[in-house]
């Protein structure tokens, strides 16, 4: 039996920080794990920028409430849930992701959390585990399941490598070129075809 592990942002929903960059005009928010593989370093800098610009958690949540999942995402997940079990494995934070997970039909989400100050500013981020995506795959495989994993960026690679089948979904050229061993899908139909071939 297969379990599917997938990333969240850039797969089913927009990148949270890119949405914030568009809303605030702060260009540095456009930097994601596609450009900066060190997620801890990236998040510490993001939190600094939020404080420098007087942006609180509620402001971020208001921006995200205006966003919708990508066209076709919910239908794709409906199909996927009929053929396998899905766990969304993301480096994002439950305080950001819950509204989107609701819009996607409430798949299981494994992610991280934030420490919020009394005045509403984000104090720091708390990673549930180091290298959490890989450890999720390890745990599932230890239960004698096979794993299909897909993601788009550097922080997904360990998860893809640890899975029985890894797939890149709409990756930047730099990631695709560095990891040519993974098949690439550029839309949900292509992803569905790759997964269907694995399952059959």
Regions found by a protein language model. Give the residues of each.
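Substrate-recognition "cap/lid" segment bordering the active-site pocket of phosphatases
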Residues: 95-147, 178
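Short, well-ordered alpha-helical microsegments
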Residues: 94-98, 156-157, 192
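Short amphipathic alpha-helix with an adjacent loop that forms part of the alpha/beta core around
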Residues: 194-200
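Alpha-helical segments flanking ligand/cofactor-binding loops in enzyme cores
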Residues: 78, 138, 157-158
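Acidic, Mg2+-coordinating phosphoryl-transfer loop and its flanking beta/alpha structural elements
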Residues: 86-91, 145-186
């Amino acid at each position: 039996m297969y379990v599917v592990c997938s990333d969240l942002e850039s797969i089913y929903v927009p990148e949270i920080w890119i949405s914030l960059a568009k809303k605030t005009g702060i260009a540095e928010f456009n930097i994601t794990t596609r450009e900066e593989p060190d997620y801890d370093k990236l998040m510490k800098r993001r939190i600094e920028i939020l404080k420098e610009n007087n942006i609180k958690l509620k402001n971020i949540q208001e921006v995200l409430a205006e966003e919708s999942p990508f066209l076709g995402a919910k239908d794709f997940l409906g199909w996927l849930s009929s053929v396998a079990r899905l766990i969304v494995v993301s480096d994002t934070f439950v305080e950001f992701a819950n509204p989107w997970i609701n819009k996607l039909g409430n798949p299981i989400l494994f992610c991280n959390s934030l420490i919020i100050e009394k005045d509403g500013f984000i104090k720091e981020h708390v990673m549930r585990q180091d290298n959490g995506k890989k450890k999720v795959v390890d745990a599932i495989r230890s239960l004698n399941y096979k794993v299909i994993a897909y993601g788009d960026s550097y922080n997904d690679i360990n998860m893809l490598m640890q899975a029985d089948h890894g797939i890149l979904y709409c990756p930047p050229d730099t990631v695709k070129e560095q990891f040519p061993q993974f098949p690439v899908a550029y839309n949900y139909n292509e992803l569905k075809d790759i997964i269907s071939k694995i399952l059959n």
